[in-house]
Amino acid sequence: IKENFIFFISSTSAHFSINSALIILSLFVNDKELGRFTLAYKVAFILRMVPVFFIQSALQQASKSFTKSKEEYKVYTSKYFKFGLLISFVISSLSFVFSDLIIYILAHEKINYSSNILSLISFVPFLAMLNFKNITYILVNDLKFILNKATFYTLIFMFISSLILSYLYGGYGMALSLLLTELFSFFI
């Protein structure tokens, strides 16, 4: 029960750090700006799932290769990591370049603010992919305590940075906070 509770806390912390952005931003901006931010945020949120899919698809084989040989595990995860970085960079770059078109298709009108926000947060998937090796190692070795600790620290960082940056810069501050949170998650 204790192990499952630790995993539950970790999952809850990760959920809050991802989904609390709109709630926090709503404290500092009007409804119009929040709606325009949300339009871009939802696109980036879907793209943010790409690294999650990579981790899920690699986890079983990574576990098998880890039990066979540490060297085989390193080769496998490095290969998968490089491929994931390439794919997430291409996806991020395309969403950056075509942010105006993406927003136009979704909103049926040109919204510069949403396009600018999407341009900023389009690299969240790439930054999240940087954490592939760390997360895979933690999951393969069943290090739930470390995962819980890391997600909790990331949650605290996200709350503090998003409160400060959203207060100072509105949606642009939240976009910056989301990018910084992904970097912070990688470095801890």
Regions found by a protein language model. Give the residues of each.
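Membrane-interface helix-loop junctions in multi-pass transport and translocation proteins
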Residues: 33, 154-187
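Membrane-interface junctions at transmembrane-helix termini in multi-pass inner-membrane proteins
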Residues: 123-153
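Helix-loop junctions and terminal segments of transmembrane helices
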Residues: 44-70, 74-77, 135-140
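Alpha-helical transmembrane segments of polytopic membrane transporters and translocases
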Residues: 5-8, 21-22, 35-51, 82-83
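Interfacial segments at transmembrane-helix termini and the short loops linking adjacent helices
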Residues: 96-129, 172
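Interfacial transmembrane-helix starts/ends
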Residues: 70-86, 93-98, 115-118
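C-terminal transmembrane helix end/exit motif
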Residues: 1, 54-60, 129-137, 164, ...
